[in-house]
Amino acid sequence: MKLGCPSSLACAMLTVAGLLAAVPAAALEPAPARLDYQVDEGLNINRFVREGSVAAHLVLRSGSDPRILIAFPAGDSGVGVWFAHRSGKIRWMLQGAPRAIQRLDGRGRALHGIVADATIEAADLQIRQVLLSSVRVLRDYQSLGAAPAAVGARPVVQARAISWSRDRLDGAAGYQLTLAVTHGGLRGERITAASDGRIGLRITGLTGEPPLSALAGKDLLNDLASSDSAARNTLAFLAYREKLLAGSWRFQTYFGRDTLISARLLMPVLSETAVEAALASVLERLSPQGEVAHEEDIGERAVLDHMERDGSRSAVPVLDYKMVDGNYLLAPVASAWLVRDERGRSRAAAFLAAAAGPAGGRTRGAALSANLRLVLQSAIGFAAQPDAAHLIGLKRGIAVGDWRDSESGLGGGRYPYDVNAALVPAALAAASQMKESGLLSPYLSAEDETLFARAAQLAQVWRDKAPRLFAIHFSHRAAEDAIRSYAVSLGVASEPALHALADGDLTFPALALDGAGHPIPVMHSDEGFALLFDDLDPARVDEAVTVLLRAFPAGLMTEVGMLVANPAFCAPSVQASFSRNAYHGTVVWSWQQALFAAGVVRQLARSDLPAAVRAHLAAAQRTLWAAIDATSSVSNSELWSWSYADGHYQIAPFGSAAADVDESDAAQLWSTAYLAVRRTVVAVGAASGARLAVRTRARDSMTANEAALQ
């Protein structure tokens, strides 16, 4: 969950003047072709439209709690209407393609949006709530059932239409939503069916936020990208010159972690323009100390933040720095592009010399050096005294800090495994690579040179010492008992898991350490970070793929994918926090599978692994890709859950069950990774960061360019 900052006291924030200034589009370039596609997932019809200055995501939610929502990448804005709960389930039907429109508000200011026609079989629809504001406001209302009173809008009821409109809270151009009844009747805020039991609506949603500049065609992808149209559509909807959006509908703005992970996984198939847009967006938003911004509040969400903090109605973006993992993701991703990829290397000096933001100030090279300095300084304590107290912990008073950023995602842990055992050593190694390349020389002081010279040695200490603190060990008998008990509680078969366990004891890394340094024995998928970013000890590689890809609940593998967590070896109270209804529970996240798959390929490219380890890697690769191929229909979604019947796991869209704590985005940036991540990869030039010759998945034919490189 991308948790926001409910108040200025909840997390560290920084306002940055100048982020509102959009990167100017190339005015002479032709406009991208119209993008129009639909994803039906669970109870949601998701229709995505991008044409000219309009980009919009229409969500029609069926079931017993119907709603209509339109989210706009422009300003992370949206409009939505929630209808009263119904005893029976009803289903929307979209009639034809939505149309992109532009209108002027009452003061002559431009509004951009869509018009769509939809029908539903229902006796009536009683309007319960209407919101026109930031998507953050709509998202929080959907999750928490509350919205700021300041964003309310009064309805204007006519004979056959009801509409809401208002300016943004700072007086800027705002939002409009109109429901025109094309079939049925309207009585106040109650829409009634015609004699045939159907309701027809013409839905118009508009925003006054400035449009973004779409990345498309060769400005987005090169010829090595998979031909998967669903993934291409998703990426095209989320990619802009100003930034890459994390997902839709709920995360239609910048998220540092999502940007960096996606850029790394997609790097072989992204254009130079797209990779540099991603990196530039992160560098632009770094704090003065070099911290990576987790999320930005823009548009009306920024206005609301300022109203709460200082009483002003400023729209200057507000940046949130509460996460810790992003600080250690920037270096390995930047190094992969600027040092290891021949395309990026040829452009690196000019890229780093450019200003880090539209307001001027420091260069990108200076900003990157600030981040690397932060990484190195934070690593010194553990290198001197390698104990839990000197690991990288969550920030004081904040319960989240890595990608598992729901309140229970780390099981109450304070020291995440992924940050300490994978990302810190990877960041230190990357800092060493970038220093040795000479790219950073214009930006480093004499003191920096001394500090950066320690990077490789610090990386080795962290690589050797940190994982040991997370080690969990169960005897064979204890592991069997835990697996049987947990399988019974879930109503799933234990036999495949027990068979996969074989005769040995069970060892795996803990998800996190608690505040006292004790391991939390949740099995997890985060070893994928280490597989992708580092040259691991062969024994660690073997343990990662052997243990994690065992059948659940001995490991993480199911027929519907690799789960991101397995609490079988925890107390029942902890198991309850990691259910298949929990956002970071026993569910499948598409990008985590892609990360692990890419990591396996990277390890297979090594020449120093024993034959037995390579054999285990190859077997793990076959197992993982069988699940990836079997779930290709949902691979562009954020995550999914599962059901179990007749001895088999089945995909269950996350957010469809009443017990699900949230819903999945139908379009997620890092879930498009399969445009680049394939079953086998042969590096051409500079390792996994360079252009790649690829043999695609079975369902995707090999392109001519790929064939020429084989």
Language-model segments: what does each one mean?
Residues 2-232, 238-243, 247-253, 257-259, ...:
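Terminal accessory carbohydrate-recognition/targeting modules of carbohydrate-active enzymes
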Residues 72-168, 330, 337, 451-517, ...:
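Low-complexity, serine/threonine/proline-enriched polar segments
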Residues 189-191, 249-251, 411-414, 515-520, ...:
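Generic recognition of flexible, low-complexity loop/linker segments
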Residues 243-248, 257-265, 312-316, 406-412, ...:
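Glycine- and acidic
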Residues 252-384, 421, 541, 589-607, ...:
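Aromatic-rich carbohydrate-recognition surfaces in CAZymes
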Residues 283-293, 355-362, 551-562, 618-633:
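Short, mixed-charge aromatic SLiMs
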Residues 307-308, 318-325, 339, 346-429, ...:
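Extended ligand-binding clefts on enzyme/binding-domain cores
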Residues 309-337, 495, 508-513, 517-544, ...:
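C-terminal capping/lid segments that line or modulate ligand- or cofactor-binding pockets
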